[in-house]
């Protein structure tokens, strides 16, 4: 006797079919959310670059250029070169390190924090004063003979502070300059801002910062002509994205990419490496 199937809903297979379609669609939707729109690639966390404060302008431009060209996000952490190095050593977090002077990369390499470095540019110490140099400061000896006030980047946290102290200790002017220093700041940009606000008469800064501070006048002094810093970028051993970190480092060091930005912002490029 034939079985009567009249009591089994004919819509059940159809409902099961549509349920399967919905499940598949939701699965692919979740996968799509984990991918970068339009690229089919999984999103990666942004690269973290520890950058000396004096390099803020070119590096912000370079990070924006890189995002536009590759879609890779770059986060920039600014501070004094020594402060950044200490932070890297403690946290072991980040992808690239870009201090104001490559002597800090040498220290980082000695601490086994650096995998590879790429030379970029050079900068020279100058004296920042108010536009027009109203106090008529012409030499560092003026600080010994007149009650001018200084704001300095801390020699223990910032590259320019360390290099200026070493140079002026050698020529016997450090004590006079230290006595005229109202405050030591964590980074060179903090010292420049003190001059901009009229809190002090002068500050030691890098010549490359002129475009950041159009309201200030930068004076080249013979006592500072040899206070120069070589700028380079290092790939950190602690990076969890070595390939991406190397790619961005090469972008920064490329003549038509990052180096072009450095040159536009007043840096002198280092000679091409063989």
Give the residues covered by each predicted segment:
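Exported/periplasmic ABC-transporter solute-binding proteins
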Residues: 5-77, 82-92, 99-111, 118-123, ...
């Amino acid at each position: 006797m034939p079985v009567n199937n009249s009591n089994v809903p004919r819509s059940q297979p159809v409902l099961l079919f549509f349920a399967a379609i919905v499940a598949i669609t939701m699965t692919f939707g979740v996968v799509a959310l984990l991918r970068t729109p339009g690229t089919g690639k999984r999103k990666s966390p942004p690269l973290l670059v520890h950058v000396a404060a004096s390099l803020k302008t070119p590096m912000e431009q370079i990070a924006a250029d890189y995002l536009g060209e590759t879609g890779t996000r770059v986060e920039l952490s600014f501070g004094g070169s020594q402060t950044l190095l200490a932070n890297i050593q403690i946290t072991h977090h980040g992808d690239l390190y870009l201090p104001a002077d490559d002597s800090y990369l040498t220290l980082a390499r000695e601490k086994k924090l650096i995998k590879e470095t790429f030379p970029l540019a050079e900068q020279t110490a100058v004296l920042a004063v108010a536009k027009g140099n109203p106090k008529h400061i012409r030499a560092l000896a003026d600080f010994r003979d007149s009650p001018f006030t200084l704001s300095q980047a801390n020699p223990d946290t910032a590259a320019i502070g360390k290099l200026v102290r070493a140079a002026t200790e050698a020529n016997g002017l450090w004590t006079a300059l230290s006595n005229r220093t109202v405050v030591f700041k964590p980074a060179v940009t903090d010292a420049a801002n003190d001059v901009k606000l009229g809190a002090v008469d002068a500050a030691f800064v890098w010549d490359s910062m002129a475009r950041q501070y159009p309201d200030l006048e930068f004076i080249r002094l013979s006592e500072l002509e040899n206070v120069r810093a070589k700028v380079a970028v290092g790939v950190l051993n602690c990076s969890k994205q070595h390939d991406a970190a190397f790619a961005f480092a090469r972008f920064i060091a490329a003549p038509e990419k990052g180096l072009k930005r450095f040159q536009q912002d007043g840096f002198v490029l280092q000679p091409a490496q063989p």
